[in-house]
Every structure is written in structure tokens, then in C-alpha cells.
Amino acid sequence: MQRRLCLSALLGLTAVAGAQAPAGRPFTLGRTYQLASRALGTTLSYQVYLPPSYEDAEYAPRRYPIIYVLDSPGAYRLVTGVVDYQITSAALPEVIVVGISATSPERDYTPTHSLIGADGKEASDLRESGGAAAFAQYLREELIPRVERQVRGTGHRTLVGHSLAGLFAYHMLLTTPDLFRNYLFVDPSLWWDRREIGRRAQAGLSPPIDGGVRQIYHATADEPPSSLFDPTEHNAANRELTALLEARRSPNLRVLVQHFPGERHGPVAVPAIHAGLSWFFRGGAPPFELYLDAARLSAFHRAAQADLGLEGLPAERDVAIMAPYIMAMPGRRAEAEALLRLNAANYPHSARAHVQLADFLLSAADTVGARTALSAALRAVPHHRPAAARLARLAPSGRRAAPQKQGR
């Protein structure tokens, strides 16, 4: 029976392989770049995802937190998928994502030289292990400076690492703790070299020396023993270090440890990355009800976003998206108007914010207010065509125009 099923599957794959895929345009999340590294003596690639408003000229330029993801392009695809969906759902502030590639994870991510693998046996592919110091130099002196000259970052950085990449992320925490604000560890390979990272953490894990806030999210899986791998040492090393993390927790060193029952070492990255990023950026995504009160929304951002390196203002794009929803709610036009006026005041150089306010005022037949908003749009961007066209259509000053539908 099993043989027939395998044969049927093979024949099905053969039929599919012979079919011509329909023509279409590639769909990608980001761009790939090359960087020649002196520290590593080779050229590596890195990927960059930009959030929706970054290249939209209709929004005022701003800066964004940056998430650096080890094990690119695989882990980068996962993180950008999660991030892009959460941004679209207004569950995460807009961020930049950078994928970091390594030529040999067994060399680049391991802090010490060791020939002993996860199964406790000697492994020939570990002969070049112990290259983490050089890879850390590449990140610190070459990649991060290059990226942050290339994009508009706030200086607020997050590092994400899974498995051996999580081991390397701990190496970064212990050697250059102030390089990143957030550290997201997914079931890291802390068994390495007889728990070498755990021994170093006993002496070296402390609150940040720059006086800022550091956040650590550590996720663990529920890997069962198998003929290929006994996770006993792996799990014990993770329990040992997470206990230390929780003991060292302080106002400046925030820690969240989360175990995922039933999730194995590889797939646990999916829920862990979603949960970790949501926790890190919880201050950047206000609940919907705050958009019904412009004053409370502003207070939320002033109080919560300092840790994110943001401006402390509601994001222009988020307000632009939420305002029409609120306007469509029965009896909420006043709240929508307050939100649009807040956006225009917060982003005076954005023609889009002024035009959106003008459209709202025109829908209420407030020609005078709309004229004022459109004039502000043209002061911000003198040749802004949508603003100029709307202003030209307005009746002479003092007359009331017929209500118009909202448009861009």
C-alpha cells in the first residue's frame, strides 16, 4: 500500500513538472545587496525590506527601527512575512528588516572552536568552528554602518537568531550588549562547547551600561528525543540560561521567556518570532479604541515610543488608514476630524495629510476650511497636483461647495 502511494505521488509530481507555469511578475519582499568584507575576506549578500510608507512620496520622510535577522535568506523570508502582515494589520509599527547571510554557520556563528556536535560526537564539519569574533566584527564595523548609511534608521536595533544563529546572538549580547536594543532568541544552540555561553553569561550578563533599556525574548521548543538527536543537553542548557535571565531581570533589563509545548526546534520559529516582535514593539501599536480619541492617542505614543527610538507621534500612515474607518462609523465624524487635524499638525510637510483633511471638510461642505487645508498642502509641496486640482475646483471664497466624495 505504501509503495503504491509513493508511486502515485511520484506520477503526480511528474505530471505537475510537465505543466508550464503561467507567466507573471515576481513578488518579492525587499532587495538583495552585496558587501565585500575585509573582516571575513569574502563577499556576502544581505537583504533589505522597507516598510510601505518608506518609498511613498506622499508621506513625509521619517526614520524607522531596524530588525537584523541572522540566517538569511531563510529566516529573513519568515520575519519579513510576519512583519509585513502585522504592519498591514496595524499590529506593529513600520520597521525596516535586514537579512544577514553567513557563508558557513558552523564557523561564523560559533564563539569557540569545538569538534563536538549536538549529539555529543565528533563532527568533521566543525573543523573551522570558532569564527564568531570575526563575524561580529563584520556586523559591527561593516554591515551595520553600511546599512544605516543606506536607509533611514532610528538607531533602535533588534537582533533575531534561531538555533546556531541564536547562539551567535547570545555572543553579541555578552560582547557588545549595547549594539542592539532587543535580542530575540529562538531555541538557541546553547549546548555548544559544553554550555560555554552559559558559563560566560554567569559573569557577563548585566543591565545595559548606557543607561537605556534592553529587552530579551527567549523562546524554547519541545523537541522530543529521536534516533538522530537527543535534545536532553540542548534543553537543559536553555533551562539553565533562561533561569539566569529571569534572576537578572531589572527595570533596564526586561526579560520574557516563553516555552511552546508541542513545537519542534525548526517550526517553533514561526510562533516565536511573531510573539517576540509583538512583545518588543507593543508600545508602537495602539489598540483601535485609542484612535477614537486624538488626545489619548498622542499621549500613548509620547509615553510608549521613547524605547523604540521613534518621534513619539502617531504614524502618519496609520492615522491616514484609520481615519476613514472611523468616519464611516455612525456618530464618529467629530472623532475622525480630530484625528485628521492631528495628522496635519504632526506632519506639516506632508501634502497628503492636508489633502486628506481637505477632502473630509469638503464632504461636510466646509469650503473655507478645505481651502485652508489645500493651501497648507501647496505650501508643503508647491507643485502637488491633487491639492492644486482640488483648489482650482473650489467655488470662490465665501460660497459653499456641494459635498464631495473622499479621494486621494
Language-model-derived ranges and their functions:
Residues 20-364, 376-378, 382-397:
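Non-catalytic cap/lid and distal C-terminal segments of serine-dependent acyl enzymes
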Residues 1, 19, 370, 403-405:
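Intrinsically disordered, low-complexity regions enriched in polar/acidic and amide residues
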Residues 3-7, 364:
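N-terminal export leaders
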Residues 10-19:
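Hydrophobic h-region of N-terminal signal peptides that target proteins for export
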